[in-house]
Swiss-Prot record:
Gene name tied to this protein: thiE
Keyword ATP-binding found: no
Family, per entry: Belongs to the thiamine-phosphate synthase family.
GO biological process: thiamine biosynthetic process; thiamine diphosphate biosynthetic process
First-tier enzyme category under EC: transferase
InterPro entries, alphabetized: Aldolase_TIM, ThiamineP_synth_sf, ThiamineP_synth_TenI, TMP_synthase
GO molecular function: magnesium ion binding; thiamine-phosphate diphosphorylase activity
Cofactor comment text: Binds 1 Mg(2+) ion per subunit.
Gene Ontology, cellular component aspect: cytoplasm
Catalytic reactions on record: 2-[(2R,5Z)-2-carboxy-4-methylthiazol-5(2H)-ylidene]ethyl phosphate + 4-amino-2-methyl-5-(diphosphooxymethyl)pyrimidine + 2 H(+) = thiamine phosphate + CO2 + diphosphate; 2-(2-carboxy-4-methylthiazol-5-yl)ethyl phosphate + 4-amino-2-methyl-5-(diphosphooxymethyl)pyrimidine + 2 H(+) = thiamine phosphate + CO2 + diphosphate; 4-methyl-5-(2-phosphooxyethyl)-thiazole + 4-amino-2-methyl-5-(diphosphooxymethyl)pyrimidine + H(+) = thiamine phosphate + diphosphate
Protein name as it appears in the record: Thiamine-phosphate synthase
Entry EC number(s): 2.5.1.3
Length: 219
């Protein structure tokens, strides 16, 4: 196995759905299935925060979600937890600046997909030099889903990464909705990542379809 190509990674980032059980008011397995039917291109398991599952329950839930992703041929990424990613033989892992360092993650994960959340050009360059396949840049807009977010960057912050010669695939993170998706792609992102825009939508399927359309129109 070799590392994923930049072109392939860029395509996978188009509509990136992030979810845990506590992000949904409906059955999370059904929400994921609808999102996959609607056209998400990659999925990240993020079981964190108030009411999140732990221990064996968390592992079982992750396996159920992973099995559904496999049915649709969509990569299954684990948020932060490298050990869980290895245990599940996940397609990759996404880490933040406060999580395990990228060099150690790359050693453990081999050629699997590694994404890194970055907020500055320095963080971005460090992540790229040490083996990141893509960057999560944000928060682009204010968000209530994640309580531990940094200052809002806006689309200008995202555009600044491209202006500074950062060419690695980038996914925009934070407060992204159907209405503002186009502006994120136009600022230089390869795709958008969302939690509540799909997980809390009246129809996860319809919401995903609209996000896919917005990204396609803007690329």
């Amino acid at each position: 196995m070799s590392r994923i190509s930049k072109a392939e990674m860029s395509k996978l980032l188009s509509v990136y759905f992030i979810m845990g059980s506590n992000n949904c008011t409906k059955d999370p397995l059904q929400v994921l299935r609808e999102a996959l039917e609607g056209g998400i291109t990659i999925f990240q398991f993020r079981e964190k925060g108030e009411g999140a599952l732990t221990g064996e329950e968390r592992i079982c839930f992750a396996k159920e979600l992973q099995a559904i992703c496999k049915e649709y041929g969509v990569p299954f990424i684990v948020n932060d937890d490298v050990e869980l990613a290895l245990e599940l033989d996940a397609d990759g892992v996404h880490v933040g600046q406060d999580d395990e360092g990228i060099t150690s993650v790359r050693e453990k994960m081999g050629d699997k997909i590694i994404g890194v959340s970055t907020h500055t050009i320095e963080e971005a360059r460090w992540a790229i030099e040490n083996g990141a396949d893509y960057l999560g840049v944000g928060p682009i807009f204010p968000t209530s889903t994640k309580k531990d977010t940094k200052a809002v960057q806006g689309t200008k912050g995202l555009a600044h990464f491209r202006e500074q010669g950062i060419t690695i695939p980038i996914v925009g993170i934070g407060g992204i909705s159907i209405e503002n998706t186009a502006s994120v792609i136009e600022a230089g992102a390869d795709g958008i990542s969302v939690i509540s825009a799909i997980s809390l939508a009246e129809s996860a399927y319809e919401s995903t379809k609209k996000l896919v359309e917005e990204v396609s129109k803007s690329l």
